[in-house]
């Protein structure tokens, strides 16, 4: 047998093995009865979460994408689904005045930051990490809480809002992602406030979506994440205004800059 023949046989055998393994995993995944709310899985995975995702995030250059997104945060900031705090190192902490490219006065940096996650175990990891990264920044709060229940701190009779809301890789684990986004829009400053999202979900390509769909129950059961959600449709149904949208990795990684629709309407009046 020629070298070419041996190579072809080896490749075909390996591909056959991969396909057989994939079919077994699909059969196993489809047999699972997994609820839509799988957020409790993070209580179990919290201690090892960073180690489990570190390599894949490096390969996908997610650190740079997180940094580019989080550096936009300013004013009073809320991060929901903060997990173990994989965004902590990217925050520009400490509010100060500056100017944009057109010379207009702007506020830069974060006056305060509130971190929220449904998992107490995840919050504890994030709290410890923040203390090591930013020991001198005191205007920070950590809460184990559902994002749909978050309200800004009271300021008497005057309505209060967050200037920036950040969420990365959170819509995949929420039982009601549309309702959560709508709530976040209601507590975002209506004129200049912003909601910053970095999410993963469905692809541009049907063949990849089929793989995601077939393996989704097993992935959700193990990792607490429905990786086949249509992020674009969730955002559309939320009613928030899309300021910026980008996608990478065959369309499975989604970035959004959003704002409340009422803010853009008021600004025009």
Where are these regions (language model features)?
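C-terminal alpha-helical "lid/dimerization" subdomain adjacent to the S-adenosyl-L-methionine
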Residues: 56, 196-255
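The conserved SAM/SAH-binding core of class I Rossmann-like methyltransferase domains
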Residues: 10, 116, 198
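A short acidic, Gly/Pro-enriched loop at the edge of an enzyme's catalytic core
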Residues: 148-165
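A short SAM/SAH-binding and catalytic strip from SAM-dependent methyltransferases
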Residues: 160-177
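A short glycine-rich, Lys/Arg-flanked "PGG" loop and its adjoining helix->strand segment in the class I
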Residues: 178-194
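Class I SAM-dependent methyltransferase SAM/SAH-binding core
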Residues: 72-153
